[in-house]
Swiss-Prot record:
<dbReference type="GO" id="GO:0016829">
    <property type="term" value="F:lyase activity"/>
</dbReference>
<keyword id="KW-0028">Amino-acid biosynthesis</keyword>
<keyword id="KW-0368">Histidine biosynthesis</keyword>
<feature type="active site">
    <location>
        <position position="176"/>
    </location>
</feature>
<keyword id="KW-0378">Hydrolase</keyword>
<keyword id="KW-0456">Lyase</keyword>
<dbReference type="GO" id="GO:0004359">
    <property type="term" value="F:glutaminase activity"/>
</dbReference>
<dbReference type="GO" id="GO:0005737">
    <property type="term" value="C:cytoplasm"/>
</dbReference>
<comment type="subunit">
    <text>Heterodimer of HisH and HisF.</text>
</comment>
<dbReference type="GO" id="GO:0000107">
    <property type="term" value="F:imidazoleglycerol-phosphate synthase activity"/>
</dbReference>
<dbReference type="InterPro" id="IPR029062">
    <property type="entry name" value="Class_I_gatase-like"/>
</dbReference>
<comment type="function">
    <text>IGPS catalyzes the conversion of PRFAR and glutamine to IGP, AICAR and glutamate. The HisH subunit catalyzes the hydrolysis of glutamine to glutamate and ammonia as part of the synthesis of IGP and AICAR. The resulting ammonia molecule is channeled to the active site of HisF.</text>
</comment>
<comment type="pathway">
    <text>Amino-acid biosynthesis; L-histidine biosynthesis; L-histidine from 5-phospho-alpha-D-ribose 1-diphosphate: step 5/9.</text>
</comment>
<keyword id="KW-0963">Cytoplasm</keyword>
<dbReference type="Pfam" id="PF00117">
    <property type="entry name" value="GATase"/>
</dbReference>
<feature type="active site">
    <location>
        <position position="178"/>
    </location>
</feature>
<feature type="active site" description="Nucleophile">
    <location>
        <position position="74"/>
    </location>
</feature>
Amino acid sequence: MDRIAIVDLGIGNLANVKKALKGYITSDPYEIEKADKIVLPGVGNFGAVVDKLAPIKDIIIEGINEGKPFLGICLGMQLLFEESEESPGKEGLGIFKGKVVKLKNVRTPHIGWNQVWIKKECKLFEGLKNGSYFYFVHSYHAVPQDPDIIATTTDYENAEFVSSVCFENIFGVQFHPEKSSKNGLILLRNFRRL
C-alpha cells in the first residue's frame, strides 16, 4: 500500500483527509520524503502558510519533480502557483506559472456547495458526473497562465473561476473533498488509487 503523507502545517482539521486517504499526518521532512504521495491541505492566509511551509518547501518540490502524485486542497492548490494578491512578496511553490487573486464582484467568502464543470479529462474525476457538487470555502482563486492545466471551473454569482488543476502527477482542488460527501470520497479514492 502506498504511503500517503498529509502535510500538517498546524492549521485545519486533517482527520477527515487522513481517514479518506488512509494516510499519515506529518510535518517531518523525512516522513514527507519517504512518502509515495503527498497531500497539502490548507486553510488560512497564503503568506502565513508560505512561512510555515518554508522548512519543507524544497522536499515537496523535489517529490513533485520526481513524479510523486501530489494533491493540493484549497489553499494547498493555491500554493502550487507563484504568488497571491493576499500576501504580496510571498512566493508559493511555483510549480505552475500564474497567480492567486481575490474573487471579484461577488460576496466573499464563497462558502457552500457548488458545481464543478469538467474542462479536460483528469483521473481525479473518474466516476464523477460533469456538474457534480463540491463544498467550497474561499475568497481567492488561482489564475493559471497555461489554460491546459485547468481541469474544472465553477460559476459563482455569474463569475467563473478555476476550481481544479491537473497536470501529469500534480492535482489541485479549490474545494474541500473531505467535506464534500460522496463526491469528495470518490475523488480522494481516485487519488489514493493513482
